[in-house]
Amino acid sequence: KNERSGVEIQLDRSDFNFPTLVLGNFVNIIIISSRFIAGADGSNSIAFFMYAVVILNVLLTSVIGNVSTILLRKISIKKNTRLMIYSLLISLCIGLLMVVGLHYFSYDIIKFVYLRGEFNLFDVHETSSYLLELSFSFLFLFIATTLFQPFLTLPIGETKRVRLKMVVFFLLSIAFAAIYSEFNSFTSKESAVFVMYFSSINAVFLAFYSYIKYDQYEK
């Protein structure tokens, strides 16, 4: 029981449904998969990738994460299409501002944040290049993160099949991107960027599909 309210929360095995865990952490799965690809050749590319992702992920978790939390809280009580549209527009605007800002200031940002100790100007250049090239993929992740929230409020038991199909498609898209980049002799950087973009674009399609399912369920 909760000591303050005295309310007992009942947990069921379905609350730990694997597809739900995957869909709820799709951003981390995409980043980890791309990170693995970035370091596949044993070069420093993985370090530059992670330095860039740290900065992009801060914006994702601090701004888009809060927007999604508010949206999730509201629509779990009552369907609110207007709030959904507002949240999506906020995510889109923030993402576009980020892309434009990084186009002009990615080098300066990396230099200000990381240029110290062993981190030299070459590292600044390589990391800022990653930062700029990954920015659009994070714009897609911003959109997908917002769009997924309504679907995740639906009862797991009644949407289990849909969740499983979405997860299978999502994981296969990552596997396909990794295999495709491997057989096309991409550099580690090109492979990591390709996996990020291919997976994040597929995540947007899945997120739109999930919202359609949510809308059908709520009618």
Sequence positions of predicted segments:
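Membrane-interface helix-loop junctions in multi-pass transport and translocation proteins
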Residues: 1, 160, 169-205
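N-terminal membrane topogenesis motif
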Residues: 1-20, 127, 157, 213-219
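Helix-loop junctions and terminal segments of transmembrane helices
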Residues: 61-79, 148-153
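Interfacial segments at transmembrane-helix termini and the short loops linking adjacent helices
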Residues: 105-139, 189, 193
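Membrane-interface junctions at transmembrane-helix termini in multi-pass inner-membrane proteins
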Residues: 136-165
